Amino acid sequence: MQNRYRGTAITACFVVGVVLFLTVGQALGQSSTYQAERTTDGKPNLNGIWQTMNTANWDLQDHPAYPGLPIGGAIGAVPPGQGVVVGNDIPYQDWAMEQKDKNFTNRLTEDPEAKCYLPGVPRATYMPYPFQIIQGTEKMLIAYGYAEAVRTVHLDKENPEPAPIDSWMGRSHGTWDGETLVVEVAGFNGEAWLDRAGNFHGSGLRVTERYTPISPNALMYEATLEDPDVYTRPWTIKMPLYRRLEENARLIEYKCIEFSEELLYGHLRKESGQ
């Protein structure tokens, strides 16, 4: 009797495995040949509200779970996650690696996110909040759920214009490469971090983003970062973006409160002498 059940279980597992293999294969095949719905000017339609499902905002690289402020308990803990860096290596110069380590040590107070500054690019894309793409023929607006950040992608200029001033979000210029929107971003102020683990860049950063539809409700997002003052070579992050499918999905007004953990729990920390 036990052997009969064991044989049935093995057969069931084999069948499930075959089905999953075929399903994954079909999905990968669709992603490489998928053609998105078109806008009135014949371009892939990227309109919608999108969001990542990863832990990149905590740390772009592979990372275990670790605690935050002791008084915050599980609420402030960092979830474990798989990295989104291709090859899992950020090629810092020696001095920059030392700075990154210092940033990590002081992350609870020095991360610009804790101070409600704009997140920069590409970080705005993978923060744990949705963002909306509003696509036009000459301009594209990307509105982010965090801190009401916005940026304009200029599609109407063959030669990118330099940013008039350095800023948190830089200046974005987009072109189409078949099914992929390619966005070149430069003109940063060098103050933003890339995640809560202290990964960072300088004012010489240039980002090349690629938005590629892979199904009706998913985009593949890639961003290549170049900054010869900080990194030894260009490097790339890659992750899927998912469409928010809730009825009447929309961005909700976000009011950022600086150092909210300190405001809520700081008096307890001081009372305990920490």
Segments predicted by a language model, with ranges:
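PEST-like low-complexity, intrinsically disordered acidic/proline/serine-rich tracts
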Residues: Q2-Q274
